[in-house]
Design a protein with these regions (language model features):
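Bacterial Sec-dependent N-terminal signal peptides
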Residues: 1-25
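Charge-biased low-complexity segments
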Residues: 23-233
């Protein structure tokens, strides 16, 4: 009996030695979304443990787990209304669920540079993270190139254009902004290397099972501070 107890205590001691201490952090992603996560105490750049992002402190828009800086297991993503948008398995890099998208109620459009026959089978490009949380980095990257408080942003709208390669890589990032009251219409292209590696990865569009080049267009409205947000947020 003593040997068994000694063995159990030894296992607990070894497990304790290998378990790394974490501390809890908060970070504001947007005006409305705050993320909560743990980081290693001896390296605060490495996320570890449960993760959640909350919309206006009430609605979870992302829930999952980090293991030593990597997303692991199945993550669930929601829109600001609490609707499940996507389930993505990061261990196997596999899409488990994607909510249906309807043209009349979506801020997203997709294009390909090919003629399509009635018999063709097409799949759209998909971003891990869903059609809300997954696209926050692309809206958050842009700011108006003029002082919004001096000129105002009333009537300003924007379209974010993401060019996705057949390998599922972000090949181009462009934003066109139109402010009718200011007679302003300008497109700005920015370096894709400004994004994190995971933000440059997509599931590519396919045509009859073959990966193809595609574009994702996101209609946005310009906020008072010159940033972007979804029209239907």
């Amino acid at each position: 009996m003593k040997k068994i107890l000694l063995f159990i205590f030894s296992l607990l001691y070894i497990t304790n030695c290998f378990a790394q201490e974490t501390i809890q952090k908060k970070n504001r992603i947007t005006d409305n979304v705050v993320e909560k996560f743990g980081v290693l105490k001896d390296n605060e750049e490495v996320k570890d443990g449960p993760y959640e992002a909350m919309y206006r402190r009430k609605v979870p828009v992302a829930m999952g787990n980090y293991t030593k800086g990597k997303k692991t297991g199945s993550w669930r993503f929601y829109d600001p209304g609490g609707k499940l948008m996507q389930i993505y398995d990061y261990d196997n890099h596999q899409l488990k669920y994607e909510a249906k998208e309807y043209t009349g109620t979506s801020d997203f459009y997709y294009t390909i540079d090919k003629e399509i026959a009635d018999t063709d089978r097409i799949t759209k490009p998909i971003k891990a993270g869903g059609r809300y949380y997954g696209y926050l980095p692309y809206l958050g990257m842009y700011k108006l190139p003029f002082n919004p408080y001096e000129y105002g942003t009333y009537g300003c709208v924007a379209v974010v254009e993401l060019l996705i390669s057949p390998l599922g890589r972000l090949a181009s990032y462009k934003v066109r902004t139109v402010c009718n009251t200011l007679e302003y219409d300008q497109s700005i292209t920015m370096n894709t290397k400004l994004f994190k590696e995971e933000d440059r990865q997509f599931i590519p569009a396919t045509l009859n099972g073959e990966p193809i080049v595609s574009r994702i267009l996101i209609r946005c409205q310009v906020k008072q501070d010159g940033g972007l947000e979804f029209i239907r947020e």
